[in-house]
Amino acid sequence: MDAILRQMRDGILRDACKLVLVFSNNPKAKGLETAKNAGIPTYCISSQGKNREDFDREVINFLAPLKIDYIILAGYMRLLSPLFIRTYQKRIINIHPADTGAFQGVGAYEWAFKNKLKKTYVTVHYVDEGMDTGDIIEQHELDISEMTTLGEIEKAGLVLEHKMFSEVLKKLFENEQ
């Protein structure tokens, strides 16, 4: 969230889009406080104790009047229901720290480290009804052959994620205009 807000304030996303809301299902999410401090409207609906479809229906009803063009998942760690995905088909974008054909879900950098991979990937993709299986928008390679700790891989991966996500979003939004 920090990286996207910085790019919207001072960087390549400044004139490319307007952030209308930061939403979370977790009232303690750091992104809510970050957005609030930046003057961005925030909203939270707790998902605790709710089934996925009922929760997503509640979120859809909240978002509907906002006429949102895209939903950008940045640290949102809850699987979306088929109802939500169909409602916002090809308008939900996620970033995943791996080749989505090789590894889906959480722990991608740890997986690359444990498997002694020479390279891994960062992938920006549309969200579909599977986990990290949507159409790839863009994918960049991350050379990890000289890295000896998981921390090094995570740090390098995060740098690439922050740079790449903003660049991909800018291209996507410019193609919409």
Task: Go through the PLM ranges and name each one.
Residues L5, S24-T42, L66, Y70:
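Non-catalytic terminal and connector segments of soluble metabolic enzymes
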Residues K18-L21, P41-Y43, R91:
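Conserved beta-strand segments of alpha/beta enzyme cores
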Residues M1-K30:
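N-terminal Rossmann-like dinucleotide-binding module
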Residues S24-N25, Q48, R52, L66-P82:
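N-terminal glycine-rich "phosphate-gripper" loop used for MgATP/nucleotide binding
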